[in-house]
Amino acid sequence: MERENPQPPPVEGKAGFSGTKDGIQSSAVEQALSGLRQDIDAIDAQIVSLLADRQRVVGRVAALKKSHNLAVYHPAREEDLISRRRQQATHTGLNPDFIEEIYRTIIRRSRVAQTGSMALKSVRSDGIVLLVGGKGGMGCYFQACFRRAGYQVRILDKENWPEVQSLCDGIDLAIVGVPIDVSCEVIRSIGPFMPAKAVLCDITSIKEQPLEEMLKAHAGPVIGLHPLFGPTTSSLDKQIIVATPGRDDNACQWVLDQFATWGAVVVRSDAREHDDIMGIVQALRHFATFAFGQFLKRRKISLSRTLEFSSPIYRLELGMVGRLFAQDPSLYSEIIFASEARRNLLKDYIQSLHENLEMLENGNKCLFQKEFQKITEWFGPFGEQAMRESTFLIDKLIERF
């Protein structure tokens, strides 16, 4: 039977001894790391505590604004704060862009908190609001907004139209929020029941024709509104509402003040300018997105497979396409087919695509580059702004996904 050879004791420089030394070093490193991590945890706890202190002060700011009917959004104050924090970051050796990103998030949460508080604020005590078409998405949204602020809210829909006279009695504001194709008919129908001093407004995505009908139907204050957000919006903070004047701006001002108090940004425009711009901002953009999605579907493209190969910008663009098709098609058909002017605009867009066929068929790279350069010059400084903003969005997308 063979005898086992005894193992020699570890000698300095041999594997066994160096392993023991490495173990000692590793333990020391872990202890050092543990101490540093405890320091970081303590600092993080202080940061959270300070943010809680800040939020309590924000609550007092909200209460003060609420008592004096001041708007939540104060852009000059926010930009001044960001500028000072960037300077402080530079002086202390921190990246100012990093600090700006943190503070924009903090400021946003502060505004949302203030907006939540201001949602309970009414600029017209004991006001009565009638929502015409109040059972739709936006009708339900505004119903919640006005009720939270203490207004008496009445709903007028198809089912209770016989009660129109009693529902209109004593109201301060009527908001018409019905499909575009019936908005003018509804406006004409409700006009005779409006109290003389009540404000009549609509919230459709076209303004020229409904505004004209409201001015005919009601002799009192008239204003056109277009909320550029949907019923799933969680907060009115910095949400845009376009206001197109109709009659007696002073009498209508309290309506705009109410939305501003809730955190919205009111943009003023005449009806024609609004409709021209919305043709591009909404109709053309939604139709182009629809066409892209339709093309992908017809080519039977595997969306999941393309995402495996995708750049962040493609994921962002595909996300916008998917977002469109996750919503109500009737809403977008109303926007796209709202007027003959919009349909003509979209036909011009399709024609402009056909004009590029010859360039593609001939493989004319020079023409493409010339057109590209012309468009670059036309975009001007916005090109650099777009690059910065889209880079920020891409970075956020990478962080999250």
Regions found by a protein language model. Give the residues of each.
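Rossmann-fold NAD(P) dinucleotide-binding segment
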Residues: 165-168, 173-214
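Conserved dinucleotide-binding and phosphotransfer motif residues
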Residues: 53, 149, 262
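Conserved N-terminal Rossmann-fold NAD(P)-binding element of oxidoreductases
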Residues: 130-133
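NAD(P)-binding Rossmann-fold cofactor-contacting core
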Residues: 141, 147-165
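Extended, charge-rich alpha-helical interface modules
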Residues: 2-127, 144
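An accessory alpha-helical subdomain
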Residues: 268-401
